[in-house]
Regions:
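Class II aminoacyl-tRNA synthetase catalytic cores and aaRS-like
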Residues: 1-600
Length: 600
């Protein structure tokens, strides 16, 4: 993961410049530049130390940092009490300075103290990063957990990311427009949260899983460039990178090409990255979907390391080696930390089988007694010298390397090898930095349904590649879409596409998907009706703010960059949500809980 950035630079600077109310200064503004000045500071007691009968040292923490205060009295104080201290800034005695703090050269001495609020014993230390309790305890007391410097930094960094995105897009002429939170059901793939209507009994709104259709309607409405930092809801199974409610940057623009859209997003993400980490001038290379699958076995490859996959089927065609004489033979040099033991190789074979492969072949490159290269492999006796030489040359292998290979159908081999490559690379290599990648030219369709109709890879409004229109009905799985994904360190940040604005093309896509005119009008009638009034060519993109913030903050889970997240089972441990509601409230919506649900 990316090393954590210094927290909240811009927001803290704004605070330091604008103290108000009960305080004259924030903690981090109490420096050697104001020695001799009288100041008042407010915050929480981070620690308290008594020296003798008449001296108390307090570390006062506020939202900007910590400052040491010296009270010439012995007072009963406890951690996390809220206090106000008034005193004079003086230089710390020699040898007691703390160079890690902005205020570490000084202290507030001869101070008077006012207790603003007492606190119960906290369930865990706010200052301790190592010995944190179970995440459930942290989420139950999230208001305490959020006092920790790491989470304070994360939330502030996230705010800077949003600020940078807004500034970047508005420099391109984008307009921030809010779209409805109560929306009509649309089949966009994920399960939606339903909201009953009290005034229209028996009818329901849904909470939007994305503003996809709304933003296209804005293009028809003549708003040339739209964006929104949008709250979205999906009632789906949760994991480390998912929440029921999430935030995404949503963007749409008229009269643009996909290159234009990628330029907008590249600049916005670059600016957000610089705001969060200080890094600038990062590269955003692009590869096609087919190239990504062929070289990395994934449509979201982690390019922080090489170890690319090479095709070897031509080398073994007609060789008679059954395990290798297959339509596709993919191979890569396994990322290693030290030497692979035989037991580790056996584990990799089992892992490949668990991923769906018939097996996994391995070749350990070694030097023979005569200086030539040889291989240690379960099928070594079947390999000719020219096979070994070509494997070494094609993959760039050297003595000690282990080559892993899977044979079979192309798509299946690449899927297994891509997973192994990612798992081994992240486990065995020191991966640092941020590596963005655009993946373009995705398939328009993925697989066939039970009726033999192609399944839309994204949504049915994605524009096909102009060169592939003629394949729509003859070979739909070969049709490429004008769609594109942005990947960071092997994580898909978001995706976008050029949309269909031509009713004829839209009709053809619906027909290819097996969607009749009647069903299309039932599902999307209001959008299709709008397109009949003049729709501009348009395209857009959306990416997850939560995921981007987690990656830029060096966190493994998005829960660490969300103020009040749910658990992986969708519970809010702090508030107790979700909860039952009163029977009369249910009745006002025309709802009742069935007996089977009561027992569930």
């Amino acid at each position: 993961m990316q090393p954590a950035p210094t927290f909240g630079r811009d927001s803290v600077q704004c605070l330091l410049a604008n103290p108000k109310g009960l305080r004259s200064h924030y903690a981090s503004a109490v420096t050697d530049e104001i020695i001799g000045h009288e100041v008042s500071v407010c915050g929480w007691i981070a620690s308290v130390r008594e020296h003798g009968e008449h001296l108390t040292f307090i570390d006062l923490r506020d939202s900007t940092g910590v400052v040491q205060c010296v009270i010439s009295d012995r007072i009963e104080l406890h951690p996390e009490w809220v206090i106000r201290v008034v005193g004079r800034v003086s230089k710390r005695p020699g040898g007691t300075e703390n160079p890690t703090l902005p205020s570490g050269q000084v202290e507030i001495s001869d101070a008077s103290l006012e207790v603003l609020s007492k606190a119960n014993a906290v369930p865990f230390s706010v200052s301790d990063q190592k010995d944190l309790p179970d995440e459930g305890v942290r989420l139950r007391y999230r208001f305490v957990d959020l006092r920790r410097a790491r989470l304070q930094r994360n939330i502030r960094t996230r705010a800077q990311i949003n600020k940078a995105i807004r500034h970047s897009l508005e420099s391109f002429g984008f307009l921030e427009i809010e779209t409805p939170m109560l929306w009509t059901p649309t089949p966009e793939g994920a399960r939606e949260f339903s909201v009953p209507s009290r005034l229209q009994p028996g009818n329901f709104y849904v909470l939007p899983q994305s503003p996809q259709i709304a933003k296209q309607l804005l293009m028809v409405s003549g708003f040339d460039r739209y964006y929104q930092i949008a709250r979205c809801m999906r009632d789906e199974d949760l994991r480390s990178d998912r929440q029921f409610e999430f935030t995404q940057l949503d963007l749409e623009a008229s009269f643009v090409t996909q290159e234009d859209v990628r330029e907008f997003i590249t600049q916005a993400v670059s600016d957000a990255t610089q705001a969060a980490t200080g890094q600038s001038n990062l590269a955003f290379p692009s590869i096609t979907y087919r190239e990504a699958i062929a070289r990395y076995g994934s449509d979201k490859p982690d390019i922080r390391f090489g170890h690319e996959i090479f095709e070897l089927s031509d080398l073994f065609a007609g060789s008679g080696i059954r395990a290798l004489d297959q339509p596709s033979v993919g191979a890569f040099i396994a990322p290693a930390k030290g030497e692979f033991s035989r037991s580790k190789l056996d584990q990799l074979v089992d892992r490949a089988k668990a991923l769906g492969a018939a097996g996994l072949l391995w070749f350990r490159i070694k030097q023979g007694t005569d200086g030539s290269l040889e291989v240690d492999s379960p099928i070594a006796k079947f390999l000719k010298n020219e096979h070994i030489a070509e494997i070494v040359t094609r993959l760039g292998a050297k003595t000690g390397d282990v080559v892993l290979a899977v044979s079979g159908e192309f798509k299946a081999t690449r899927s297994v090898l891509g997973t192994l490559r990612t798992e081994l690379g992240r486990a065995n290599l020191e991966l640092e930095g941020l590596r963005y990648l655009w993946v373009i030219d995705f398939p328009m369709f993925e697989g066939l349904d039970d009726a033999g109709n192609p399944i839309a890879a994204h949504h049915p409004f994605t524009m096909p590649n102009a060169d592939d229109f003629e394949l729509m009905f003859s070979d739909p799985l070969a049709v490429r879409a004008q769609s594109y994904d942005l990947v960071l360190n092997g994580w898909e940040l978001g995706s976008g596409s050029i949309r269909i604005h031509d009713p004829k093309i839209q009709s053809d896509v619906f027909k290819a998907l097996g969607i009749s005119d009647e069903v299309a009008n039932q599902r999307f009638g209001f959008l299709l009706d709008a397109f009949g009034f003049g729709a501009p060519p348009h395209g857009g993109f959306a990416f997850g703010i939560d995921r981007l913030a987690a990656l830029l903050c060096g966190e493994d889970t998005i829960r660490e960059v969300i103020a009040f997240p749910k658990t992986q089972s969708g519970l809010d441990l702090m508030t107790g949500a979700p909860k039952q509601i009163a029977k009369d409230t249910l009745q006002s919506y025309g709802l009742a809980i069935s007996e089977s649900q009561k027992k569930a």
